[in-house]
């Protein structure tokens, strides 16, 4: 049993490492099954009325009423971790509850190391400041997240990371979108109210859109955003050191100009 206390002053630096914990008011309960010199199973229930901190020199973020239940199981290949009923408050905004499942597979003969993350639903806009402040992202990724300002809802999220690989399939993903939007950044177009599904890897992606009130803005090419009452399309993209290639083999939209169907190919060089 962990009593409600400010744990920030008790946690050793070798545990927090690059994270700065200004306050960690938390308590809960933990059950452990310890065998063969390591944890085999664990269950934890945590409630943190207040958490304040940041990663490295990034601006700190304050989180209130963080709650979760965690289940850990060691397997023959690695481990499974389930975070259930994860929820928190950011000011007046309540985020969650969310279920996250992390599976780790260690490298072995005939088997590569792999990390798999599944999430049922993520509301992006409230989550942005938390990720920016606490996630150990490379500076370029942190800059991209700040510039893109993602919003909307992601669901049925599946991520697969294979750290030993050097090709584009090192990271693979698939997810559903509901009214997702991003701001323009380095040739990537701004998007508003995109709904559908997306899958891909580090360099290539495939998006299937079925959206109402869709907005699309190539800020390096056109002064204004294209707006459509309805839009259905397949969008394919390729991103590398040369820039972004975006194409649509089929596109059907209804806007101020009426019904339009066709295809397009856009190349944006760095």
Q: What function would you assign to each model-found segment?
A:
Residues 188:
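Ordered, soluble secondary-structure elements with a strong preference for glycine-centered loop motifs
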